[in-house]
């Protein structure tokens, strides 16, 4: 009997320890850099993310302004990056990187027929050239009783100049009332643990939950910064729901802008504009794909891109779930006739 007790107690302790340990969210950080440089003498603008030794992001030639996706690895002072257009690899960049984030090396086309020298570095002239995206996540499988999967991002803008405006943006964009990275991680983790405990206590109602919030910088210049916030929520039922919204801020005031369509468009009911959006929808879809094609108007959710304005239709807004989130982009020249002259975005169309 004594031996049995001796063996049971350590086993029970280990079991309880594993349960507690498994309920501790993991924390990770990803650094965002706003970069400028050139490839073969052609100016580029780059949104670069570094997480550990992993590089992701996108860039565009300033003369073309069409995003090119990138991913690769950094190892000490060397790096290798592949670039893609529509998921097709078109070139690679490899070379050296210094401690102050100056990248240089050779750009080589996939067919090996073209080779150019490149360099890019942090755009120090910008008020915002670096931000940290902090993530807290927790995944638990109760083995037959349900699965819990939650992940949340928050962002803090590097603020060496102690600008109240930049701090205002950092606090507002994710709703986390802290500027300290450890404090932010703690807040995110407490929110996730609270959700977990609520889920665990209601397993009879829902067996699985999957909730995610991802934040990316979708556009940045000297006047505005836009964050794309993508959410996914599954709390039972047939399927989960994706949402995408842009949080756009004035860098001079820290105020959020672009909340209403009236801040951008002079007359959202203009039939020329409405017909234009419907024609764009028909490029990839047919009229029967929508609930009521002739009732479709301009979405009041939009984001900025290097080439124009992207309008975002949430799931179920104009079509069924299978079509997902629908995004339609206008070039600046296409949309210019419909822009308010006093819009905070008017400078983009000049």
Model-derived regions, located:
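Central antiparallel beta-sheet cores of small beta-barrel/beta-sandwich binding domains
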Residues: 24-99, 104-107
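Sec/Tat signal peptide C-region and signal peptidase I cleavage site
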Residues: 18-22
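Edge beta-strand at a domain terminus
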Residues: 23-29, 62-78, 106-137, 242-251
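Active-site acidic/histidine clusters and adjacent loop/turn architecture
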Residues: 123-223, 313-318, 325-328, 332-350
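Bacterial N-terminal signal peptides that target proteins for export
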Residues: 1-9
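Acidic/His-rich structured neighborhood in mature extracellular/periplasmic domains
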Residues: 198-255, 259-264
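Short aromatic loop motif centered on NTY/YTY
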Residues: 92-94, 261-328, 336-350
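Bacterial N-terminal signal peptides
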Residues: 8-17
């Amino acid at each position: 009997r004594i031996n049995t007790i001796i063996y049971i107690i350590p086993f029970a302790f280990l079991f309880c320890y594993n349960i507690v340990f498994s309920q501790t969210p993991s924390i990770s950080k990803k650094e965002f850099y706003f970069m400028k440089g050139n490839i073969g003498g052609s100016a580029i603008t780059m949104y670069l993310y570094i997480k550990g030794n992993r590089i992701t992001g996108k860039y565009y030639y300033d003369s073309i302004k069409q995003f090119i996706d990138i991913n690769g690895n950094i190892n000490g002072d060397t790096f290798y990056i592949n670039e893609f257009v529509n998921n097709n690899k078109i070139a690679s960049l490899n070379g050296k990187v210094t401690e102050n984030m100056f990248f240089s090396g050779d750009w080589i086309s996939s067919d090996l027929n073209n080779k150019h020298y490149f360099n890019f570095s942090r755009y120090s002239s910008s008020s915002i050239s670096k931000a940290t995206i902090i993530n807290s996540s927790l995944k638990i499988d109760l083995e037959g009783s349900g699965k819990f999967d939650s992940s949340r991002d928050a962002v803090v803008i590097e603020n060496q100049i102690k600008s109240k405006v930049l701090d205002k943006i950092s606090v507002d964009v994710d709703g986390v009332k802290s500027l300290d990275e450890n404090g932010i991680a703690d807040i995110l983790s407490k929110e996730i643990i609270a959700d977990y405990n609520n889920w665990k206590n209601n397993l009879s109602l829902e067996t699985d939950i999957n909730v995610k919030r991802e934040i990316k910088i979708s556009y940045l210049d000297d006047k505005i910064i836009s964050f794309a916030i993508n959410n996914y929520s599954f709390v039972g039922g047939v399927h989960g729901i994706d949402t995408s919204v842009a949080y756009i801020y004035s860098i001079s005031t820290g105020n959020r802008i672009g909340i209403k369509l009236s801040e951008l468009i002079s007359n959202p009911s203009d039939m020329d504009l409405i017909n234009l959006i419907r024609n764009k929808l028909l490029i990839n879809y047919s009229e029967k794909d929508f609930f009521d094609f002739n009732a479709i108007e301009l979405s009041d959710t939009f984001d900025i891109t290097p080439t124009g304005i992207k309008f975002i239709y949430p799931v179920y807004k104009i079509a069924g779930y299978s079509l997902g989130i629908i995004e339609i982009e206008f070039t600046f020249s296409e949309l210019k006739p419909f822009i308010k002259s006093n819009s905070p975005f008017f400078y983009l169309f000049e």
